[in-house]
Amino acid sequence: MKISLLGHGKTTLALARFFKKNHNEVKFFDDQFTSFHKDREGFLCHPSKDFNPNDSQLEVVSPGISFTHPLVIKAKHLVSEYDYIDSLFDLVFTPTIISISGTNGKTTTTEMLTMLLEDFKAVSGGNIGTPLIELFEKQSPLWVLETSSFSLHYTNKAYPLIYLLINVEADHLTWHCNFENYLNAKLKVLTLMPKTSLAIIPLKFKEHPIIQNSQAQKIFFDKSEEILECLKIPSNALFFKGAFLLDAALALLVYEQFLKIKNLKWQDYRENALKRLNAFKIGSHKMEEFRDKQGRLWVDDSKATNIDATLQALKTFKNQKIHLIVGGDIKGVNLTPLFEEFKNHEVSLYAIGSSASIIQALALEFNVSCQVCLKLEKAVQEIKSVLSQNEIALLSPSAASLDQFSSYKERGEKFKAFVLKD
């Protein structure tokens, strides 16, 4: 079979290796290629303009490529990674799948839930860690998948046993074109889920037509305290706060529902689940606190690539002066809601990246103190010169990092290095 892989990344490379083993002809097409060549694994790589849909029998799209891209528009046999993997399942091997999506918190919740389900041989994949085709080849029985809106947009058949949607706030609007498309992508899987599946959804979306018309069983949630009350867990029994408490509560709720499906009793597992969860360490660059040589508090929240994540960060330091580094690739999102929230905080802004001028204009409009620094190192230097012991220095950019860095991880590492440098 002639297979075209649209986009040359981790997901499609894993698929290419699988296709090659099964004697298929594989070609990559990507905007990053300016001429035909072979990559380091010997795969054929072509510029996007060379794609001929009549010379292809199957196209698998890398989730980061927008539905408006000419490659996607020209494709005649387009499938998502999820749908292709779903087509491989049969009576011999079909894993149990739990999918987790949301604007924020999906990585943390996926990691927490995978840890809780260790005894059931759970493995995580999708957006984090392992591509789905590698989980398939390992025949892992239980998949906990961090699932992006991009993957959900392209998926037309595959569905999980349990779908958890943590939240939906404005993000990725450049890719989706508008918020309605973004929300619909997050909810699309509910149109595919049968009566035997379960969706756990924020209460505020209860009346949405997609949810109303879905056959799936549904549980709606609002606050972490209410979830924990239903699970008969005191909120002070968990060592997390703010958004991380909600992530933990939702991981426990999914775990409890999974046990129920398996005809196992929650009370037999509850105490051990709490012990495991309280031993969980939040990953780097997510509200990661550290101190400089003068003992002043700095917080690396580089993973805050959208407004909602920064709003959550601000709540944590409600009664302290905050020196906030903000800016980067804002992905077409209107930052006004962030500036409206600044009215409730004592905050000084240090604007970096490609959105610095937009941030400066909004700061003037909302009468918020703002220095245009452009570079992260300059922002750190400015804060170092004024930061008091009882104040907070916070990197929570509300923006992606790719205008200046290779990833949010690099942005966070450089932030820490600049702070700790003499």
From Swiss-Prot:
Pathway, per record: Cell wall biogenesis; peptidoglycan biosynthesis
Catalysis: reaction(s): UDP-N-acetyl-alpha-D-muramoyl-L-alanine + D-glutamate + ATP = UDP-N-acetyl-alpha-D-muramoyl-L-alanyl-D-glutamate + ADP + phosphate + H(+)
GO-annotated cellular components: cytoplasm
Main localization category: cytoplasm
The protein's Enzyme Commission number: 6.3.2.9
Location in or out of the cell: Cytoplasm
UniProt keyword list: ATP-binding, Cell cycle, Cell division, Cell shape, Cell wall biogenesis/degradation, Cytoplasm, Ligase, Nucleotide-binding, Peptidoglycan synthesis
Pfam families: Mur_ligase_C, Mur_ligase_M
One record GO biological process: peptidoglycan biosynthetic process
Stored InterPro entries: Folylpolyglutamate_synth_CS, Mur-like_cat_sf, Mur_ligase_C, Mur_ligase_C_dom_sf, Mur_ligase_cen, MurD
Amino-acid positions noted as binding ATP in the UniProt annotation, renumbered to this chain: 102-108
Gene Ontology MF, one: UDP-N-acetylmuramoylalanine-D-glutamate ligase activity
Function noted in UniProt: Cell wall formation. Catalyzes the addition of glutamate to the nucleotide precursor UDP-N-acetylmuramoyl-L-alanine (UMA).
Family the UniProt entry places it in: Belongs to the MurCDEF family.
The protein's name: UDP-N-acetylmuramoylalanine--D-glutamate ligase
Protein's organism: Helicobacter pylori (strain HPAG1)
High-level lineage: Bacteria, Pseudomonadati, Campylobacterota, Epsilonproteobacteria, Campylobacterales
Gene: murD
